[in-house]
Curated annotation (Swiss-Prot):
Zinc finger (RING-type) boundaries: 15-56
Source organism of this protein record: Homo sapiens (Human)
Keywords: Metal-binding, Zinc, Zinc-finger
A biological process term (GO) from this entry: regulation of gene expression
Lineage: Eukaryota, Metazoa, Chordata, Craniata, Vertebrata
An MF annotation (GO) of this entry: ubiquitin protein ligase activity
Domain spans labelled B30.2/SPRY: 269-452
Record-stated family: Belongs to the TRIM/RBCC family.
Protein name: Tripartite motif-containing protein 51
Amino acid sequence: MNSGILQVFQRALTCPICMNYFLDPVTIDCGHSFCRPCLYLNWQDTAVLAQCSECKKTTRQRNLNTDICLKNMAFIARKASLRQFLSSEEQICGMHRETKKMFCEVDKSLLCLPCSNSQEHRNHIHCPIEWAAEERREELLKKMQSLWEKACENLRNLNMETTRTRCWKDYVSLRIEAIRAEYQKMPAFLHEEEQHHLERLRKEGEDIFQQLNESKARMEHSRELLRGMYEDLKQMCHKADVELLQAFGDILHRYESLLLQVSEPVNPELSAGPITGLLDSLSGFRVDFTLQPERANSHIFLCGDLRSMNVGCDPQDDPDITGKSECFLVWGAQAFTSGKYYWEVHMGDSWNWAFGVCNNYWKEKRQNDKIDGEEGLFLLGCVKEDTHCSLFTTSPLVVQYVPRPTSTVGLFLDCEGRTVSFVDVDQSSLIYTIPNCSFSPPLRPIFCCSHF
């Protein structure tokens, strides 16, 4: 081939970022092509818009498909480079005068075909160099994809841990104030219990704050290690075929060792401290009422009155639930404009639920709106992500770092005090009190059950 044409051919198959032959090439919407790993590394810290390093155009593209044509052409170019390397005198067997085309997995050496069948190497594993090297590259690319997903997960966890660390002391202070306010409603002889409760809460808060800081530091270290290993694997893929085959085992061992070192996030949780007499103080405000039948659905099970209501949220228990995410809402038939009221709901060991009270205009919408931090919704919710369940309250949206109730949850509505309190009945403990609620009477009970 004419040398000028060869140079054009090689340039067309070269990534403009790493200046090597394409490795898992992708073409972005501006028309320029790059190695996928190079784009990943360049775009790692870009939230939404990314920029082409060639034309500087921005793109939102994230799900990129491999350019098969470019990939095959790059493979041919690497194979041509290998054949040029093997044609040198150093790669001709001195005994048999044949090209060393075989790679011995045991000795990590190049052999000609007769040598690979000799008594010395007969029991070893051999493979043709050009195909073995490309297979190893493909294996490394799969490891790199797995590593990148791990790095992205670590980054999400790091951001979450950073947010938790920044907000943790404020959350503990908020909880201390809620517990103190609850004890102020109790008899004076519980003063000593209150002091012990608050002191334990402060100590737990300080310990968890330290754990969060340590976890954040570990994740930052993991981030550097993961990125470094990703770059090492990329460089290994770009090595000449023989070098790649000889070093493959060592870098694979390093990769597997690194995965064992990646830190997992802390799931902070303050203990549920029981408050003596809490349930007795609420029982005097207990009410019975029903849900509106036309708003109920098959995932909220009613047994007479609200105090006997069960919420079922495990899709495995109901064959009628599809794989599509659905959210079911139901309202109480009664509405409240003033006074104090208390009721209980048996949640069991379920998740993906929310209940509380809402301003009446939510009912008038007559549609399944998203349950989020919108004004006029005063809810306690439980969501499951992977294997971990988290609690939250709304108005404003606050994650609650306390144990998930696994049986019955109580709600206390104080219209004049403008508060909504949630209690873990089994533990006789306060989950949280939403203060300064922007009530617009009438207020109605609301229940939500979501299935995935």
